[in-house]
Amino acid sequence: MFYVIGGIIVSVVAFFFTIKFLFELAARVVSFLQNEDRERRGDRTIYDYVRGNYLDPRSCKVSWDWKDPYEVGHSMAFRVHLFYKNGQPFPAHRPVGLRVHISHVELAVDIPVTQEVLQEPNSNVVKVAFTVRKAGRYEITVKLGGLNVAYSPYYKIFQPGMVVPSKTKIVCHFSTLVLTCGQPHTLQIVPRDEYDNPTNNSMSLRDEHSYSLAIHELGPQEEENNEVSFEKSVTSNRQTCQVFLRLTLHSRGCFHACISYQNQPINNGEFDIIVLSENEKNIVERNVSTSGVSIYFEAYLYNANNCTSTPWHLPPMHMSSSQRRPSTAIEEDDEDSPSECHTPEKVKKPKKVYCYVSPKQFSVKEFYLKIIPWRLYTFRVCPGTKFSYLGPDPVHKLLTLVVDDGIQPPVELSCKERNILAATFIRSLHKNIGGSETFQDKVNFFQRELRQVHMKRPHSKVTLKVSRHALLESSLKATRNFSISDWSKNFEVVFQDEEALDWGGPRREWFELICKALFDTTSQLFARFTDSNQALVHPNPNRPAHLRLKMYEFAGRLVGKCLYESSLGGAYKQLVRARFTRSFLAQIIGLRMHYKYFETDDPEFYKSKVCFILNNDMSEMELVFAEEKYNKSGQLDKIVELMTGGAQTPVTNANKIFYLNLLAQYRLASQVKEEVEHFLKGLNELVPENLLAIFDENELELLMCGTGDINVSDFKAHAVVVGGSWHFREKVMRWFWAVVSSLTQEELARLLQFTTGSSQLPPGGFAALCPSFQIIAAPTHSTLPTAHTCFNQLCLPTYDSYEEVHRMLQLAISEGCEGFGML
């Protein structure tokens, strides 16, 4: 009986297994017949399906080489394990149609990946490597033959990295704060990681004790760095990714503060503080709210040459009328002085003067016979005018203030109400620039004010008919009788003999072409100091006689037009397609020339002459304060004295900095004085000078020319790969381009600078590089890349993995973009 029951049970089980097998077999046959088209079926047979001898996406697995959560910036990898339907390993070297797509969910940014078949015992594993820079949630889709693998898509969260002090900033930053004694002031700090991610998920945001604040008083004891008594508290808000530093000072005076994270100063963490009493604060508020009226302070003027805040001085610079326009530095006070003296008078004792502060200017005047005003100095109320705070003067024991605008020699003043004077100036400055000194806030203020300037002028269309074959001449002719109102209108460009209607395309093309016609060296209006097409352009001091100065006015108006169009936003945004020298940009905003401009503008001259003078003893050199000027045939044309009696004044170790700055003034500014004046005349017709003055020369370039984004596709299309084995060309180069595609614009600029010596491309992009960007297969393995900047060559060794390429390239461009690894 027992055997009978057991036999029945075995038969039933066998029957059920048989039925299951038949159902599975039927399902595979139906799937084979209905769902597999000819292309996907390939050489598979129904027998393969019956045996499960085919690649099945649902049987494959994905394993991750990291544990969640993980920080951005690292080389990440996961593995796709391929299996037949029957569970046997599927050889990955066979074509399987593996597709991996990784994208940021919120930003919709695709991440480049590399695939590599691992030579494991079963050879059924594909390693997928990638790098992410932006924190957030990512979707990872893995497909085989169009079907998702296992549980694909997968979702992974990458957290921001640790706080990087150089990326962390104060919101609404000011170089000088005006506070009230005993009243708290809160500073908003935005912690960022290396890739500018907010640290909302980072432990560093909760590490509030890592933020420190050091304050010392400015004055006679500044060298001793005396600490000041103050109260400080730090809190954080993880939702807004901000840290709040609450500061209270209990003593009046001028101080210097520095905010640090883990003993490293943050990006804009250094600033001055003026602390006023309640009564002084009310006086300053009343001064600033008084519109259009100059507030004056009694002071004593010391000899500017005694000022120690600057190591060098320049001869008097007489501003031309075009540099004064329009209505910025010279306003309501113009009528009250018969003349203006720019040369500081040699005084043995302090001179009693009066300092006037208005919304637009800060002026120093002397009164003759107590009734006749005589203007001694005028400074614009703009970020370029810097104050230095010193201790009491030796004569009257009054607090001292040094004013330096980078144009005139610094002026040293002592004043009983110095702190009120400085606070009035600072508050007026803050009103002038829109309440913040950060670049983006200044851009927003600039564009808002520029729209206000042209608000009453209609932005209706005006037709501009030009010839493509004589673009510059026809454009000059078409705009010859244009008023400022016409330049403010929306240009509708019509190219002769072309029927295209201008819905924006012809206008943008005209801006592109006219910028090239004006600022390319072939027009001879602008020139380079070196023969390299990567060099910056500067007004040409040797322009042909037929190129009239009116053309520089036209160039200035064009730049002003681009700035105005960009202020309108949207489709009107228009960048200036040019790469100007730093010294030319500095002259646009009225800055004084400095020998350091040679380093970027004329690097060959800087290396050959400037560095030689800086690094050598001048006692045995027969060098004088004069410059030899040669003609085109190389013969000496004339000798130009850099100062009165310069041909008889030797250059010594004591005055060589003074000599180099005079040389910069002559070579970079004096030789192109007329060209710059006419350029400014055209520019200031559309853009007031006081608006441009809120930027420095680097910010001005960003405002006019943009960031100059580097296009990876353009890079890849024009880069030339030289030499190399199969491993180098097929694997290392694939890893290299994947790493390059993952780099930020800042990192791409560093890579470009590492290889070419410049962080910017010519207007034509990589195609315009001469010689072309070359990637040379270096005869080394697993070492740092090197570069030959003179030949635009990147020497790339061989590597064993994507992670190694990423690590070595990152190290090279971060540590060596200014010399490390460069040849």
UniProtKB/Swiss-Prot annotation:
Residues 483-823 form the HECT domain. Gene3D superfamilies: Hect, E3 ligase catalytic domain, Hect, E3 ligase catalytic domains, Immunoglobulins. Residues 483-789 are annotated as: Interaction with SOCS2. One of its GO terms (biological process) is protein ubiquitination. It catalyses: S-ubiquitinyl-[E2 ubiquitin-conjugating enzyme]-L-cysteine + [acceptor protein]-L-lysine = [E2 ubiquitin-conjugating enzyme]-L-cysteine + N(6)-ubiquitinyl-[acceptor protein]-L-lysine. Detected in brain, testis, heart, liver, lung and kidney with very low levels in skeletal muscle and spleen. GO terms for cellular component: cytosol. Disruption phenotype: Mice show significant and stepwise decreases in indicators of inflammatory injury, such as bronchoalveolar lavage fluid protein concentration and cell count, as well as decreases in pro-inflammatory cytokine release. PANTHER family: APOPTOSIS-RESISTANT E3 UBIQUITIN PROTEIN LIGASE 1 (PTHR11254:SF340), HECT DOMAIN UBIQUITIN-PROTEIN LIGASE (PTHR11254). This is Apoptosis-resistant E3 ubiquitin protein ligase 1. The gene is Arel1.
